[in-house]
Amino acid sequence: MTDQNWKESLNIPQKDTRPQTEDVLNTKGKTFEDFPLKRELLMGIFEAGFEKPSPVQEESIPMALAGRDILARAKNGTGKTASFVIPCLQQARPKVNKIQALILVPTRELALQTSQVVRTLGKHLGLQCMVTTGGTSLRDDILRLNDPVHVLVGTPGRVLDLASRKVADLSECPLFVMDEADKMLSREFKGIIEQILAFFPTTRQSLLFSATFPLAVKSFMDQHLTKPYEINLMDELTLRGISQFYAFVEEKQKLHCLNTLFSKLQINQAIIFCNSTNRVELLAKKITELGYSCYYSHAKMPQHARNKVFHEFRQGKVRVLVCSDLLTRGIDIQAVNVVINFDFPKTAETYLHRIGRSGRFGHLGLAINLMSWNDRYNLYKIEQELGTEIKPIPATIDKSLYVAENEAAVPRPFKIDQLPKGNETVHKKSGYEYKGQPEVSSNVAGMPQQVPNGPVPPQQVNPSQGNQMPPQQYPGYPPQYQQQMPPQFNGYPPQQQYASPQYQQPQPQSQQQQFQ
């Protein structure tokens, strides 16, 4: 293989032709070959489908290779992971059997994803990457560390445990990386991070990446980073390329609204967020009863089950994933083009990370928020903090806002009637999934009756139905929030205060149960 034809032997995947937003396309025109990278590393980069560096990669990779500490702020889904993985792989030496880079992340799923990126980009380098997280066998991790490990990816608690037992030797580790630094320096992890740093040499290089930088990050920077190179590619926190809508929906109407969205939207893959683990499992079951294959994941599940869900969802074996905020941090599944907040989040930070699961790497995405009347205060607060606008949901959502023109390039998950033979089970719960054709039932509160051909179509509702309350002014809130007082939930809700009546379904007065 000569210098001229070394690219010809690479197994380069098909080019992704989906449109991208300017925060990914607005680069300085550099290529990965402009950086002082090993040929073997470049081979892994190109075979992973990388074409040219994103803005955050253009800014961070040269400075990291120069040995500078880095504090980088960029929006979700713009290539932050490769921004620190590439310098780690470039600086690691395969013949030195010591840990040469530690990458800390807040969740187990993100650790698995990051380790996979390390292995993919570094597959020609002869480096060994190990992932270690809580919920897995400590004994197995200890045995694995008897073999050479060059890059260690893990969650803080397990890494501290291994370092304290003197199994993971960090005394000569030159590179310390924190992804999702805002979460890592919260009260939950900050003390652990400080203890881990005590095992490092004083001359280490530190790389911090995040979408938001609270005061805790600045305090950590002042204490532990040496003249850091600061990168800020977020003049505002608005997630470009993601269209955001809301609908005021009574609790018992949410499931029908979700069913209507399924019938109206063109979904490659969708993530649906709930605010509690109990609601995650119950919603997953009811989505299955609507006739859709569905996985769910939350923090109380066994680690092996979470791993399997995450892996199979990434592989496109299912269209819908219901989860708690477990998957809001850094998870990169580019086939996800729709995020639905079944429960509206309480904080702007949570909202930002949730909807950032769509529109990855500058591609188009759609975020829909199902809101109760009391959520309107949080809606206004989040809009103000993020400098964004969340619009009322229209009767028809333009597909060009979230669907790629070349759909053949996007993996298409299965629906129930498309599942491979052998998956036709009835409400079979295996700890983490609901798959198969459901039994027909019309007795579930808030759910439309099933028919042989699938869920019933959305129904138009007469806006005149329901109890009307006089308008109530809320000082300090814009006019669109100064609508009517919450309805008396004793019949049909007044449809004027809900966006798009076709997303509502009338309920008999006797049906007072709510989705709990």
Swiss-Prot record:
Keyword Nucleotide-binding: yes
Reactions that this protein is recorded to catalyse: ATP + H2O = ADP + phosphate + H(+)
Pfam family, one: Helicase_C
Residues the record lists as binding ATP: A74, K75, N76, G77, T78, G79, K80, T81
Renumbered ranges of motif Q motif: 30-58
Domain Helicase ATP-binding: residue ranges: 61-231
GO biological process terms on file: mRNA processing; mRNA transport; regulation of translation
Low complexity bias: start-end ranges: 461-471, 479-516
Region described as Disordered: 1-22, 436-516
Domain of life: Eukaryota
SUPFAM superfamilies: P-loop containing nucleoside triphosphate hydrolases (SSF52540)
Any one of the GO CC terms: P-body
Biased composition range(s): Polar residues: 1-14
Sequence motif: DEAD box, positions: 179-182
Class of this enzyme: hydrolase
Keywords on record: ATP-binding, Cytoplasm, Helicase, Hydrolase, mRNA processing, mRNA transport, Nucleotide-binding, RNA-binding, Translation regulation, Transport
Subcellular localization, as worded in the UniProt entry: Cytoplasm, P-body
Assigned EC number: 3.6.4.13
Domain note: The Q motif is unique to and characteristic of the DEAD box family of RNA helicases and controls ATP binding and hydrolysis.
Function: ATP-dependent RNA helicase involved in mRNA turnover, and more specifically in mRNA decapping by activating the decapping enzyme DCP1. Is involved in G1/S DNA-damage checkpoint recovery, probably through the regulation of the translational status of a subset of mRNAs. May also have a role in translation and mRNA nuclear export.
Protein name: ATP-dependent RNA helicase DHH1
Species: Debaryomyces hansenii (strain ATCC 36239 / CBS 767 / BCRC 21394 / JCM 1990 / NBRC 0083 / IGC 2968) (Yeast)
Gene giving rise to this polypeptide: DHH1
